[in-house]
Amino acid sequence: MSQTIDLTLDGLSCGHCVKRVKESLEQRPDVELADVTVTEAHVTGTASADALIETIKQAGYGATLSHPKAKPLTESSIPSEALAAVPHELPVATADEESQQLLLSGMSCASCVTRVQHALQSVPGVTQARVNLAERTALVMGSASAADLVQAVEKAGYGAEAIEDDIKRRERQQETAIATMKRFRWQAIVALAVGIPVMVWGMIGDNMMVTGDNRSLWLAIGLITLAVMVFAGGHFYRNAWKSLLNGTATMDTLVALGTGVAWLYSMSVNLWPQWFPMEARHLYYEASAMIIGLINLGHMLEARARQRSSKALEKLLDLTPPTARVVTEDGEKSVPLADVQPGMLLRLTTGDRVPVDGEITQGEAWLDEAMLTGEPIPQQKGEGDSVHAGTVVQDGSILFRASAVGSHTTLSRIIRMVRQAQSSKPEIGQLADKISAVFVPVVVAIALFSAAIWYFFGPAPQIVYTLVIATTVLIIACPCALGLATPMSIISGVGRAAEFGVLVRDADALQRASTLDTLVFDKTGTLTEGKPQVVAVKTFNGVDEAQALRLAAALEQGSSHPLAHAILEKAGDDKLPQVNGFRTLRGLGVSGEAEGHQLLLGNQALLNEQHVATDDMTAEITAQASQGSTPVLLAIDGKAAALLAVRDPLRSDSIAALERLHNAGYRLVMLTGDNPTTANAIAKEAGIDEVIAGVLPDGKADAIKRLQSQGRQVAMVGDGINDAPALAQADVGIAMGGGSDVAIETAAITLMRHSLMGVADALAISRATLRNMKQNLLGAFIYNSIGIPVAAGILWPFTGTLLNPVVAGAAMALSSITVVSNANRLLRFKPKA
């Protein structure tokens, strides 16, 4: 018997999260219908609550059983026409309390990431945990306490620290990174200072074979090497031991095994040479020291490169000034930023950085918003305009009232989105995760198998060849490069996008954006300025223009439609009559009664439905529509009275931006509620390939579905509340800056500047990021696929040579450095204009 189960959801942050959960539930044979929002799910079918919760967890989110109480429907609870298009299926901003970021230490490779992630996800209350090897951080969603999270990480054998304040956390992260680089540097110097002279001496003078004459000298070198292994390489052995206790294996395990076996063999030969044949008395002390030195050197260079990749987020954090100038009855005073509260009056002068969001109450100024929006040209701001934290006053002086402070400012929201995106993992990275989970055990197995083959079938002295093969295979294998390949590209790509005013919700959005072939644009406010103007008024049946404007404006007083503002503005300051019986006719227009007249105002379909003859207007309707204007028709007492031609001009950069997108190979589609004639005229001017006209607000998502059913990968670009369902339905939703909060929260990508050039920039950066990610993954796979067989001696039958363990150590270090350096190229990426 079917039942409906109500679940409370955790960890969903956008329309695609909703879509993913819905699809996961509806794939179950025992689920008939799943109604999913960002906070809850109502599932009808025969499945049990536990089974549904498990399905949602497998999709990467959290769920608990809920028992909501029914609420009586009142008139005020009925949604408005504008909101009816997006009833309850849209996400809201995730509150700060729902996520915590931890600083991690002790991680060295992708296997460590898997271990820490499992430890965090096992903590009660955690709905999602994202561990980032490149940043050495973990972003944890859910209600678990910081103490529980830190304890779980420490129990897994790693270090963790929870710091709430973004700036303090970043400072701590920088301190740790600098200290780590210094530590790796001196460890590398110490190890190489011992390893290089011994290796050179062996190549030039002594042949590294122990004899009765040099036995004591080699014993001293062995003890010095042991000291190097303890002080310069101790972290490898400590971490390997912790991993062993936790039943896992990491890169440190490979290094510890390789260098440890080489040293133990050498010391055994040194102490008991009589146990070994003469040709097997070769010593490998220099290999242990050199390997530790080279890998530490690689870690130092890698840490330095990783620090460069985090500069974008550091720049955003540095935008907030430490103090603000507050204006009170007693005058002006400088106060710490933490003391500023909403409603306070603040002053800004030339050169000041805006401390919080607010609205200008007095004065004018030019503000540089480049770091926030990517817009290089300073913007003039005056009374009533908004200012945002992080922007800079280039010239002028203003008073403004604080409206959002602390974590509620636009800048804080951007930092939060960038941080979450940098911690996310795309679908392509999941392959690397699966391989990383079994990488180290497989490498150890390959090393043992290869050593066995050389021991039983190799040339004499077998024990020497066995040792070299096992050590080289263990050392050359590099899970570190595999673990860094995806997160380094994401950190650099998301950071670079932020510098262009492009905010990416998660790494999946970047991956999806790189595969798009069709871009759908909402017309009003996206392709156009969103500020329509009445460009012509034509009257009929003896009605004069002033009367037509006055009555039309009176009706539009009750409408929130963008065209209504244009008509009200055209009417000016004239006193407007009172309207009775006002009604909004969805998709048609409005109606009402004023000054004893029955009024209709809307499109031609409205007048036709009300049996108002429009024959006299037909020629003018066609003429205005063909010029790109929207004809708004007025009928008085059942007769056609006037035509108001309203035109919303294209944005200044729309044509250039669309041409740029055309050249990049995208098919461009315009989605609008306008009549086909008007829509086609605008599309022709803008260079649009395809027009979908006459679409009602709640039909936009269906239009996107139809395009997707044709096999297209679709992005929707919009800015209004009624665009939100389409933004969620599209493969990638792109919200224009300055748009509604609902649209921005639904979109996968948000443009901070209201310019279509941002769309081209966003798509170019997404393609570059995915290309970089593939290069890193391919490089890591090729390195290991070639390096491990070569280390195992596959070239011996053809060349008669084996790879030296020292060369293997250098190659391992170089592989990680190469991945990080390649990802850092994204920090210099510039989209082609």
Curated annotation (Swiss-Prot):
It holds the Pfam family Hydrolase. Cu(+) 2 binds at C109, C112. The chain crosses the membrane at residues 186-206, 217-237, 253-273, 283-303, 437-457, 463-483, 778-798, 800-820. Its EC number is 7.2.2.8. It is an enzyme of class 7 (translocase). Residues 3-64, 98-161 form the HMA domain. Belongs to the cation transport ATPase (P-type) (TC 3.A.3) family. Type IB subfamily. NCBIfam families: ATPase-IB1_Cu, ATPase-IB_hvy, ATPase_P-type, PRK10671.1. This is Copper-exporting P-type ATPase. It comes from Salmonella typhi. The lineage of its organism: Bacteria, Pseudomonadati, Pseudomonadota, Gammaproteobacteria, Enterobacterales. The gene is copA.
